[in-house]
């Protein structure tokens, strides 16, 4: 699958109104479906006297809608059966034997959950205003998302009862969407992909105008799947999902050329391989600077918005906050894509067979790097970076492996220390080397190696223990190259100081001729509005 992203910010366009209406109605539809499920859950278990007014109203709509839907389903079934009986023949007899009547079951105390088909029938038969004013299938997709969240909640609860240590806490009921808009979803029946005059367009349902999404060559040979309109910090982000018929590359059984990646803070990515090339670091100072500026500016804006109000319940939304968040996400996204393409090109040049990326399952919850480092580390979306690297590497035919990086920074890769998995309650093993100071690791022989390079090599060894077998490892500590993100951008051009500009010879001649011509006109016709003459003042 391939997803193409387009940002849309033209508020004067007809598409802005269309996207706003559909995303707002999607939020209302999802909250309405959630409201019906929650009130059915609580109201069906109570007696009629104990139910609240909302529970009574919801249950009335539920039972009325199911009753009408069953009556219409029975009428359709009987009419089809009558047509098949009249037609006669062997074919109609076979179809008649396979004909099944649709019956919606009423909720009970034990089976109270309303699935997608039941909710759709209830809203349709009761003529719910939100359901009726929305475009076809967009409202149904909103109901599907709500039901899917409830199904995920039930599955999580079953797993939580069996193995609660897998979770950080007890799963909670699906809540309501607090924002004003939610992501709307169009299938290929309600948003068609068309081509005209070398351009690609999306034709949305109930809209005459076509939305241009780029050149025709960008979409030829791809199968269109769906379109999502996502509210994005005061704008809209259009996500077009396409099937590029590409399969995820198979993982080799015994790879010879492996690349290990250790994500970090000061060094955004540390890359080391087992094929004799010097490791390199992609510096993370730019990402830290972006986050630092974002956090400071955001704190000032929120302080100005909540001044004089309770900060925990006040409204924290403004155009400045939207623009600040949007610029930060766009900047990080651009840097992550550049890092990913740099890594993949490096891997293709050196014929890498597999890339191993380290990760910590609970790095956001249980990190302990100090107050300042914790704030910087938690605000960097490392999972998004890993997914971008995976997507681009798979597109180029290089498989990606995620490896738990516990104890990779403590074990010595030069001494071939075993790298175990972390288990709560177990005593950690003793390792040959240790970290002497910031950024350096000393092995048992006294050799100093970059600490992040040592971690990247151990990530490879943890996945493939024999990756460095029979190889000299001196290339890991002899030279460590550094890559700065700033080098991937064009240099800043200073503005020319216009005050230092001197006229050329031709300009002076041209202006001189003009002044002489104006003087001749003044002699011939006298003073005019277009000719300046000094005002004589009395002595």
Predicted segment positions?
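A generic secondary-structure signal for well-formed alpha-helical elements
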Residues: 30-37, 41, 150-157, 267, ...
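Generic detection of short hydrophobic beta-strand segments and adjacent strand-loop junctions
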Residues: 4-10, 209-215, 280-282
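Long, compositionally biased intrinsically disordered regions
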Residues: 1-135, 306-318, 437, 476-477, ...
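Short amphipathic alpha-helical coiled-coil/interface segments
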Residues: 26, 142-150, 321-328
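Short amphipathic alpha-helical segments
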Residues: 18, 22-25, 134, 138-145, ...
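Acidic carboxylate diad motif detector
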Residues: 59-232, 375, 379
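Positively charged, helix-rich recognition surfaces that bind polyanionic ligands
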Residues: 234-539
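Stable alpha-helical structural segments in soluble proteins, enriched in small hydrophobic residues
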Residues: 33, 141-153, 453-463
């Amino acid at each position: 699958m391939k997803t193409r992203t387009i940002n849309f910010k033209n508020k004067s366009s007809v598409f802005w109104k269309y996207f706003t209406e559909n995303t707002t109605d999607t939020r209302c539809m999802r909250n309405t479906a959630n409201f019906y499920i929650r009130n059915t859950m609580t109201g069906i278990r109570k007696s009629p006297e104990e139910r609240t007014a909302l529970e009574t109203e919801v249950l009335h709509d539920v039972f009325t809608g199911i009753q009408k839907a069953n009556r219409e389903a029975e009428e359709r079934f009987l009419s089809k059966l009558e047509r098949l009986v009249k037609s006669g023949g062997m074919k109609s007899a076979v179809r008649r034997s396979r004909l099944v009547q649709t019956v919606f079951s009423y909720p009970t105390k034990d089976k109270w959950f309303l699935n997608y088909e039941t909710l759709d029938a209830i809203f349709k038969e009761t003529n719910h205003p939100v359901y009726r004013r929305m475009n076809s299938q967009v409202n149904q997709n909103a109901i599907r998302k709500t039901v899917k969240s409830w199904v995920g909640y039930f599955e999580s609860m079953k797993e939580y009862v069996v193995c609660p240590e897998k979770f950080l806490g007890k799963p909670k009921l699906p809540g309501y969407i607090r924002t004003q808009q939610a992501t709307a979803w169009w299938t290929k029946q309600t948003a068609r992909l068309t081509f005209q005059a070398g351009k690609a367009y999306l034709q949305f349902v109930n809209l005459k105008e076509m939305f241009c999404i780029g050149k025709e060559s960008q979409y030829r040979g791809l199968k269109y799947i769906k379109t999502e309109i996502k509210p994005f910090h005061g704008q809209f982000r259009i996500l077009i999902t396409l099937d590029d018929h590409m399969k995820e590359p198979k993982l080799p059984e015994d790879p010879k050329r492996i690349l290990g990646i250790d994500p970090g803070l000061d060094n955004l990515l540390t890359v080391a391989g087992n094929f004799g090339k010097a490791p390199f670091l992609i510096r993370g100072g730019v990402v830290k600077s972006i986050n630092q500026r974002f956090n400071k500016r955001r704190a000032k804006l929120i302080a100005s918005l909540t001044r004089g109000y309770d900060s925990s319940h006040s409204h924290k939304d403004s155009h400045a906050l939207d623009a600040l968040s949007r610029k930060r996400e766009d900047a990080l996204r651009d840097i992550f894509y550049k890092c990913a393409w740099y890594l993949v090109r490096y891997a293709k040049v050196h014929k890498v067979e597999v890339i191993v990326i380290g990760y910590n399952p609970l790095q956001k919850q249980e990190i302990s790097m100090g107050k300042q480092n914790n704030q910087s580390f938690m605000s960097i979306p490392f999972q998004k970076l890993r997914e971008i690297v995976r997507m681009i590497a798979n597109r180029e035919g290089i498989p990606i492996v995620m490896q738990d990086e516990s104890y990779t920074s403590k074990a010595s890769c030069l001494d071939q220390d075993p790298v175990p998995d972390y288990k709560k309650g177990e005593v950690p093993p003793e390792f040959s080397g240790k970290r002497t100071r910031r950024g350096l690791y000393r092995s048992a022989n006294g050799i100093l190696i970059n600490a992040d390079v040592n971690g990247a090599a151990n990530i490879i060894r943890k996945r493939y223990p024999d990756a460095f077998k029979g190889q000299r490892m001196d290339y890991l500590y002899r030279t460590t190259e550094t890559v700065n993100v700033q080098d991937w951008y064009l240099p800043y051009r200073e503005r020319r100081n216009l005050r230092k500009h001197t006229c050329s010879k031709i300009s002076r001649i041209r202006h001189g001729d003009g002044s002489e011509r104006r003087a001749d006109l003044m002699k011939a016709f006298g003073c005019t509005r277009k000719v300046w003459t000094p005002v004589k003042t009395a002595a």
